[in-house]
């Protein structure tokens, strides 16, 4: 792509570094900004800069937060003895949206993935193990996505905390609510049969 | 969507103002920036700001340019008597890529579109009419996309310059090179029959 303007070229090049945004899309976005008032570009740049400079991570659960300890960890009503292990802030948001979880979280910041060069030392695993060893934790819930990397990470952590006398659970895998059985893949359907739950549980409150 | 951080929320809100980028995509992009070195966010913000602040438009053809007169208009080898009328810089880039055009351009900056509230006065039409009336132009080539808005814009300009003694042409519509006839729509196929060209022209150079 040849540009008639170095300024446009530079903006497009920087924009197309973002995942899923190619040169063409980047050019479309940049031209859109050109048509909008100057302030919009100013607001966007400033918001990104502020976010990148001032962002903090909760020193307890490592979630993204504006304060030293995030709102969830600072909430004394929540059950601090149950820790849900997730990959990143998006998973926290997804679980919070269900309104079904009253414990706290531990954000790993990724999954063990040799292909992408992510090893255990780059993730917030040691602080989780320490928490468990401190004896204040009653249950750990693994809520990583059910991929090769997720399972590897689960197992890596499990090996380090298996000797502690705590409950270690993982979120249930099974047929989505509202799904037809015939379209489910075999592994999911198989798991949902193996891990069947007492029928009474499905209509009684816990 | 509820965010645990106002900084993230603001960045996501600004990002999702861009066309085709929803809140979820914006969050993905913002989290990507968080994982990259701080410099990348700095470069991106700076490139966008510089682009928006310092961008110039060629005073002759209104194309985006870093200088007062763009490279194409400043090039004395090009034929300044032939003007190709296009919508924006993307069309200039597309035509330049063909390597088939040696004239200069006139960038309208959009198409007449009552639905989007774009009238003739918001486009660079009057300066085009002036150029034609100055008598230095021999041919005008309309190269707007073949939509209702494009045709309206073509016709609006045509009405104002029809009395000048210049050649007014429009780019050929027809079956794409490499396309099968049976899959072409009727209107395009019809046009390509009506506007058939002497066979000799297709293998002789001009």
Curated annotation (Swiss-Prot), chains A, B:
The keyword DNA repair applies. GO terms for biological process: DNA recombination; DNA repair. Pfam families: RecR_C (PF21175), RecR_HhH (PF21176), RecR_ZnF (PF02132), Toprim_4 (PF13662). Keywords: DNA damage, DNA recombination, DNA repair, Metal-binding, Zinc, Zinc-finger. Residues 81-176 form the Toprim domain. GO terms for molecular function: DNA binding; zinc ion binding. PROSITE patterns: RECR (PS01300), TOPRIM (PS50880). A zinc finger (C4-type) spans 58-73. Belongs to the RecR family. May play a role in DNA repair. It seems to be involved in an RecBC-independent recombinational process of DNA repair. It may act with RecF and RecO. This is Recombination protein RecR. The lineage of its organism: Bacteria, Pseudomonadati, Bacteroidota, Flavobacteriia, Flavobacteriales.
């Amino acid at each position: 792509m040849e540009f008639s303007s170095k300024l446009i070229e530079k903006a497009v090049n920087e924009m197309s570094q973002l995942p899923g945004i190619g040169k063409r899309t980047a050019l479309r976005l940049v031209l859109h900004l050109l048509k909008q008032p100057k302030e919009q570009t100013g607001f966007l740049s400033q918001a990104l800069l502020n976010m990148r400079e001032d962002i903090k991570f909760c020193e307890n659960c490592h979630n993204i937060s504006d304060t030293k300890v995030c709102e969830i960890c600072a909430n004394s009503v929540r059950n601090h003895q149950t820790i849900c292990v997730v990959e990143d802030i998006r998973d926290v948001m997804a679980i919070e949206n269900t309104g079904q979880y009253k414990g706290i979280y531990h954000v790993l910041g990724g999954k063990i993935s040799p292909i992408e060069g992510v090893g255990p030392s780059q993730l917030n695993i040691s602080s989780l193990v320490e928490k468990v060893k401190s004896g204040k934790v009653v249950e750990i819930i693994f809520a990583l996505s059910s991929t090769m990397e997720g399972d590897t990470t689960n197992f890596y952590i499990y090996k380090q905390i298996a000797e502690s006398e705590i409950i270690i659970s993982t979120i249930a895998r099974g047929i989505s609510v509202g799904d037809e059985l015939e379209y489910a893949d075999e592994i999911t359907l198989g798991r949902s049969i193996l891990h069947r739950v007492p029928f009474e549980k499905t209509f009684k409150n816990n």
